[in-house]
From Swiss-Prot:
<feature type="compositionally biased region" description="Low complexity">
    <location>
        <begin position="61"/>
        <end position="86"/>
    </location>
</feature>
<feature type="active site" description="Nucleophile">
    <location>
        <position position="185"/>
    </location>
</feature>
<dbReference type="InterPro" id="IPR038765">
    <property type="entry name" value="Papain-like_cys_pep_sf"/>
</dbReference>
<feature type="region of interest" description="Disordered">
    <location>
        <begin position="556"/>
        <end position="585"/>
    </location>
</feature>
<keyword id="KW-0788">Thiol protease</keyword>
<feature type="compositionally biased region" description="Low complexity">
    <location>
        <begin position="556"/>
        <end position="571"/>
    </location>
</feature>
<keyword id="KW-0833">Ubl conjugation pathway</keyword>
<dbReference type="InterPro" id="IPR028889">
    <property type="entry name" value="USP_dom"/>
</dbReference>
<keyword id="KW-0378">Hydrolase</keyword>
<feature type="compositionally biased region" description="Low complexity">
    <location>
        <begin position="9"/>
        <end position="20"/>
    </location>
</feature>
<dbReference type="GO" id="GO:0004843">
    <property type="term" value="F:cysteine-type deubiquitinase activity"/>
</dbReference>
<dbReference type="InterPro" id="IPR018200">
    <property type="entry name" value="USP_CS"/>
</dbReference>
<feature type="compositionally biased region" description="Acidic residues">
    <location>
        <begin position="112"/>
        <end position="124"/>
    </location>
</feature>
<dbReference type="InterPro" id="IPR001394">
    <property type="entry name" value="Peptidase_C19_UCH"/>
</dbReference>
<comment type="function">
    <text>Recognizes and hydrolyzes the peptide bond at the C-terminal Gly of ubiquitin. Involved in the processing of poly-ubiquitin precursors as well as that of ubiquitinated proteins.</text>
</comment>
<protein>
    <recommendedName>
        <fullName>Ubiquitin carboxyl-terminal hydrolase 20</fullName>
        <ecNumber>3.4.19.12</ecNumber>
    </recommendedName>
</protein>
<dbReference type="GO" id="GO:0006508">
    <property type="term" value="P:proteolysis"/>
</dbReference>
Length: 695
């Protein structure tokens, strides 16, 4: 056990400066926290399609902060509404009616409570605007009281020129929102921070995907999946996307993770970064100098000093983010000071120098800094009965210098200054209940709030007043996401134009933007890898696909890209048809290129050899290859349809039954015994497979 003693020295390791950090200036230090609290709609976990409870509206005070809600027996709890006057209304990410009015595919009956209202509130009457609580669906509920008089009290204040009120500007320059698939807010909040991490994007651009990858799982590649996710999030359509890749593979990251169950965002962050590090362990797979390990991985040095002979032993520990105690601190700097403080060990240990069993002192210092420093503020502690949340505001700076907490100066004069660009916040009173959302800083003075599928512009002072849970700091000199976003947009649009018209199936969408852009492909158990690292063995039926084309053939042959660009690797990974097509669902890209054609409701696979991939490098060769494969498919289809062949060619049928079919009336319904024997003969000679099975 580590205990801090007042009489221990300030440091037992050589340091370039004192352990006491320089005072870090924060914004609005004297400003009241109560005046900066955002609209926290509810701390109880409830379904998001409930209307606002009107009983609580009468008691709301716009200038006060409500205390955490009491814990009730069972899952159901009443809504506890926290609100205040906001300087300016947030800018909602709304979509036009002709752009995103496509039904959302319901993937499970457990998602019945997911909010079906994806439109903005500006199109509805002022007195009937719906309210969605800031919680994840899955447990509990809010009261369902509708009262027009009470709802009218919550209307925004109308200006004197109400008829000429200016409409809010659309949100641009950031990624799209993410649908809540059922208590998946912990995943959404972390991935929004990943999507806007510039060093991570740069490392993904330089990654060369190999088959098989180094993830240790042939069915799921973390790097390929996160690349695909970021590409989909930066599409210009700005429709929210559904992260089925990761949601359906939560068990891959940890056996404790279950779908539709609220998980801890920090635990998921650590599990994801661990898998990302394993997948990117081969540095030769990265063409650039930045690897996925360099983005988040740092190193600590641990020093043990013998209190008898003053001998100091040093060991190095790999670190992916720091977990900081906040119970006795009020700023991020003081939390780091407490983390690097010298502590005296209660247990006596044997000294390697004097060979005596003596007391020792321990100190942790930063030795190597990553490109992105993550800090986890420990807001949950075990009180003996359950995990209790620490409701305490910790002041976080926009900029921080980590030099005072390091052992020595970084090599090659690497900067030790970092700027805040993202954070994750938790609402609620327990680690198992509540809601997660994230805040992203895309430019020095531009912040956005990502609350699942909703993306709004938010003031910087409002962000700094939140009770943050996970902090993301980028090293000084790192480009802002807004500049990277502008560079990637032309390449994103080019990838849309270069998408093959035969890469999709017939659909009734007619090119409209889906309200739910999904990049999930079928079931996830025992299936080969698809283009984004997601397993896919059982082929979907025709109606499950979404398309922009009226073609009847699906082509997903792999081909290599002849040119390389700084940003093109993310947008055009490995093959042109593998790029994400807006408002479409990706088809699998297994270790063997699979050609599929639709005849009626069945799929006929044609497996191509790997050496044939180069033949599809040019458009003409690709079209010629496609025609040849279509002819081959037709011949294969005829050979696999024994019911269209003379019945005399069918073997293993009893003579009596054969005579009944050959010479009898074919329109006559056969006997059950004859039907059974015929089915056996057809299965022996071959029949169209209902599902594609790959061993």
């Amino acid at each position: 056990m580590l205990m801090a003693k007042p009489d221990v020295p300030s440091s037992i390791l050589p340091r370039s400066s004192s352990i006491l950090p320089n005072s870090i200036e924060t914004l609005d230090e004297n400003e009241s926290i109560e005046a900066q609290v955002n609209n926290v709609q509810s701390l109880a976990l409830s379904s998001p399609n409930r209307d606002r409870s009107d009983d609580d509206d009468n008691n709301n005070n716009h200038d006060s902060v409500s205390i955490p809600p009491p814990i009730y027996d069972g899952y159901s709890s009443s809504s506890s509404d926290e609100s205040q006057s906001v300087p300016s209304p947030p800018i909602n990410l709304d979509h036009d009616d002709d752009e995103c009015q496509i039904p959302i595919r319901n993937t499970s009956q457990a998602l019945d409570d997911i909010d079906d209202d994806i439109w903005g509130d500006d199109d509805l009457p002022e007195t009937r605007r719906p309210w969605t609580p800031n919680v994840s669906p899955g447990f509990g509920s809010d009261d369902d009281d509708d009262n027009d008089d009470d709802n009218s009290k919550n209307e925004p204040r109308k200006s004197l020129f109400y008829g000429f009120r200016q409409e809010p500007e659309p949100v641009t320059g950031v990624g799209a929102g993410l649908w809540n698939l059922g208590n998946s807010c912990f995943l959404n909040s972390v991935f929004q921070c990943f999507t806007h991490t510039v060093p991570l994007i740069e490392s993904l651009l330089s990654f060369r995907y190999e088959v098989p990858c180094h993830c240790g799982n042939e069915f799921f590649c973390v790097i390929r999946a996160i690349r695909y996710h970021i590409e989909a999030a930066l599409r210009p359509e700005r429709c929210p996307i559904a992260p089925y890749f990761f949601f359906d593979n939560l068990n891959y990251f940890s056996p404790d993770f279950q779908r539709y169950q609220q998980e801890d965002a920090h635990e998921f962050l650590q599990a994801f970064l661990e898998k990302l590090e394993i997948c990117g362990s081969d540095r030769t797979s990265f063409r650039g100098d930045i690897t996925s390990q360099d983005v988040f991985s740092g190193r600590l040095i641990s020093g043990l000093r013998c209190c008898n002979c003053d001998y100091v032993s040093e060991t190095y520990e790999k670190s992916v983010g720091l977990s900081l105690e906040i119970e006795d601190v009020d700023t991020l700097g003081s939390a780091l000071e407490s983390f690097t403080r010298v502590e005296k060990l209660d247990e006596q240990l044997t000294c390697d120098n004097c060979n005596e069993k003596v007391s020792k002192e321990k100190q942790l210092l930063l030795d190597k800094l990553p490109l992105v420093a993550t800090f986890h503020l420990k807001r949950f502690k075990n009180n003996g009965l359950y995990m209790e949340k620490i409701y305490k505001h910790v002041k976080i700076p926009l900029e921080i210098d980590l030099q005072p907490y390091m052992r020595n100066i970084q090599e090659n004069e690497v900067s030790t200054k970092y700027h805040l660009y993202a954070l994750v916040e938790h609402f609620g009173y327990s680690v198992a209940y509540g809601h997660y959302s994230s805040y992203v800083r895309s430019a020095p003075k531009i912040w956005h709030h990502f609350d699942d599928s909703k993306v709004t512009r938010i003031d910087e002072d409002m962000v700094l007043s939140q009770d943050s849970y996970i902090l993301f700091y980028a090293r000084e000199g790192t480009r802002w996401f807004s500049s990277v976003y502008e560079e990637m947009q032309p390449l994103v649009e080019a990838s849309l134009l270069n998408s093959s018209p035969k890469s999709v199936l017939d659909s009734s969408t007619n090119g409209e933007c889906l309200s739910e852009i999904s990049y999930e492909n079928g079931d996830k158990a025992s299936k080969p890898c698809d283009s984004a690292g997601v397993c896919n063995q059982h082929v979907k039926t025709k109606e499950d696909f979404v398309s922009l084309s009226n073609d009847d053939v699906f082509l997903s042959a792999e081909s290599s890209s002849g040119e390389e660009s700084p940003m093109g690797e993310l947008l055009d990974p490995l093959d042109p048809d593998d790029s994400y097509s807006p408002c479409t669902e990706k088809e699998s890209d297994s270790c063997l290129a699979i050609e599929r054609a639709t005849i009626r409701d069945d799929f006929f696979p044609l497996l191509l050899d790997q050496n044939q991939e180069s033949s599809t490098s040019s458009p003409k060769l690709q079209e010629r290859t496609f025609e040849m494969q279509l002819l081959q498919m037709e011949e294969t289809t005829k050979s696999q349809e024994p019911w269209k062949q003379p019945l005399s060619s069918i073997s293993n049928i009893a003579d009596s039954m054969e005579a009944e079919f050959v010479y009898g009336d074919l329109m006559k319904k056969p006997s059950p015994r004859a039907r059974e024997l015929l089915d056996q003969a057809i299965s022996t000679n071959g029949s169209p497979p209902k599902k594609l099975k790959t061993t």
